[in-house]
Amino acid sequence: MSSNFAPKGKLYLVPAPLDFGCDALSPITDVLPLATLQVAASLQHWVCENAKTTRAVLKRVGDVVPLAAPIQQHSITELPREVHKKGDHVGAQAGLQKSATLASSKPSVPAGIYDARPLLKAALDGHNMGLMSEAGLPAVADPGSSVVRAAHALGITVVPLVGPCALLLALAASGLNGQNFAFVGYLPTDAAHRSKRIRELEALAVKTGQSQLFIETPYRNAALWGALLASLQSSTLLTVASGLTLATSQVISKRVVDHKQSATLMFLDAPCVFGVGV
């Protein structure tokens, strides 16, 4: 039983390599500094997007820094699938509140937000914990914000570790406005709705100067790229960052008219970040 006066563990936000689902893997020491690897190797309690991916990353970590315990002895808990498919923020999670398992006498959680406090019991018992998504920094364009929010509510220290974040790498290399930008997630898959959304984002970028960043499932990248070229104005600046941190990484940022004229070739089967700006 944990005590209100017992030292609490910390929640470490552990970045994962960006090569999830790719044919070739980057050496983990190329993308994660030793300090991050050392912390990851010390942890035995995890909350994650995908347990299989987390175990695979831990195996790679263990090849560099010995793990504190065999992977089979680690406690690895996945976030509910609804959280990673719909997000764990206000609005996206209407209805998920009913799945919360803590009693109403605990600190309140606003309606419509997934209650992740039960996942942090190990930290309340004094154990350090890790949060990991399938690729990149958890809770940024990935699941995990509900866990971080719960940690703050419970008085658990949150420690972000250094590692890759695809959105920031893409933005930095794009030439788009890095002082005012938004990540808008996935665009609609329906062709008509997708084109409408693309034009809305373009209008917002033109009106405010705010860069608009978004992603897509790799097998839909080619369709999205075609829709962007067909829907955007010729003068709009369009960026695609493909396979970031991989040997085949490319970041190309041009006006739409120039993309059309040069027939930009990209590794669109790799994870991509797309950007629209002025």
Regions found by a protein language model. Give the residues of each.
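Short, solvent-exposed amphipathic alpha-helical segments in soluble enzyme
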Residues: 35-37, 62-64, 146-148, 227-233, ...
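Short glycine-rich anion-binding loops that position phosphate/pyrophosphate groups of nucleotides
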Residues: 18-20, 52, 134-138, 218-220, ...
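Acidic beta-strand-to-loop metal/phosphate-binding motif
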Residues: 47-49, 130-135, 211-216
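A contiguous loop/helix-start segment that scaffolds small-molecule binding in enzyme catalytic cores
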Residues: 2, 8-12, 75, 124-128, ...
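Glycine/small-residue-rich loop that forms an oxyanion/phosphate-binding "nest" at active or ligand-binding sites
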Residues: 78-141, 145, 150-153
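Glycine-rich, flexible N-terminal cofactor/catalytic loop recognition
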Residues: 2-86, 97
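Short active-site oxyanion
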Residues: 40-46, 156-159, 211-212
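Class I SAM-dependent methyltransferase SAM-binding "motif I" and its flanking Rossmann-like core
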Residues: 141-204
